[in-house]
Amino acid sequence: MHKMRSRLAALAGIAVLVAACSSGASSSPSSAAPSTAASAGGSAAASTAAGDPKTAKTTAEGGGVDAICAAGKTEGQVTLIATPDNWANYGQMMKDFTAKYGIKVQSDKPDANSQQEIDQAKQLAGTGRQPDIFDLGSVVAAAHTDMYAPYQPAGWKDIPDGNKEATGLWINNYTGFIAIAYDSKLGDITKFADLKDPKYKGKVALNGDPLSASAGFNGVVAAALANGGSADNLAPGVDYFKNLTTLGNLIPVNPNDATVASGQTPIVIDWTYNQGGLISTLKPKGIDWKIVVPSDGAPVAAFYNEAINKDAAHPAAARCWVEYVFSDAGQNTWLKGFALPVRLQAMQKAGTVDATALAAVGAPATAPVQLTQAQTDAATKFLKDNWKFITIPA
């Protein structure tokens, strides 16, 4: 269920999205006026001097969305990796993309983390089976920019400068918050402190090892903030989980849909958009799945990042995929999966956001904490030296 995720954008980017969720704000100082080219489909931004859709660096250079996606259809498929169906509504995203463009989506290793995405791309380079698209956290993404092909989709101008690499090597796509998801039969849970209760012995799971999975990493950050720590001091977070382990409450299990459904992991610390997708699937099984952003610390958020593999076996289809996920339709699909899309502010201004989905997501009133790259690097080193009391399998 885990993927290595973290931050590449400025804190302001997330703060703006939180404001949009909380108050219905319709403008952002870091967003350009919404581009009509960002609507789903169409031949927007077509160029009279269009280049090859397989190597295009912009929508216009590829001849427009229609031309790019037509070329992608001839390639037959686009290969994704680390995109679980329930994660930010990726399952629906893939279905809608195929229905619209007739391009098959090959989804490999849905539970892979970011480093495994990169490893897979290297191991399968040139075979035709390598991933065409990456969806990465910052620790890994920042270390492998030489593996990406720059591309600027039709909605490029709607994306704040702080949420994208200048040439399009990577683009922040969506964000969310660290939350506690739980079976309501266990009683109300509102904060990290609640998880120390003896009645939760053997019931708490962290989504992924903090050394390799961003949900786990940011779970430690959130626990630190809830226990007197800060973005510069994760020791209280490590101590918190060490205590949970000693109590027997934290278990060495990497949670997934099956462990939740079976009752093995009835409490999961994870991203809102990962657990949000389980609400509807668990309901028929008699499980009322609740999600709460812990109240005993500032909320923790992080954007994910979209990038095209420069060694993509289906380069036009990869560009078509990027066009779709950053279109209004794609961004609203993420929103329906409890994820806040990067173009949210521009879409609100244009009146193209799904208001019902936006209202369902909700957002904490407090501005979220997002580690800088320097803080992420320091925290990673600290965890390597101090996270030794429990091993959460990949």
Which role does the model predict for each range below?
Residues 16-20:
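C-terminal motif of bacterial Sec signal peptides marking the signal peptidase cleavage site
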Residues 21-32:
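Bacterial lipoprotein signal-peptidase II cleavage site
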Residues 62-74, 83-104:
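Short, polar/charged alpha-helical segment
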Residues 79-94, 106-122, 129-264:
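Extracytoplasmic ligand-binding site segments that recognize negatively charged/polar headgroups
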Residues 139-145, 267-287:
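A ligand-binding cleft/hinge motif common to bilobed small-molecule-binding domains
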Residues 348-394:
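Extracellular/periplasmic bilobal clamshell ligand-binding domains
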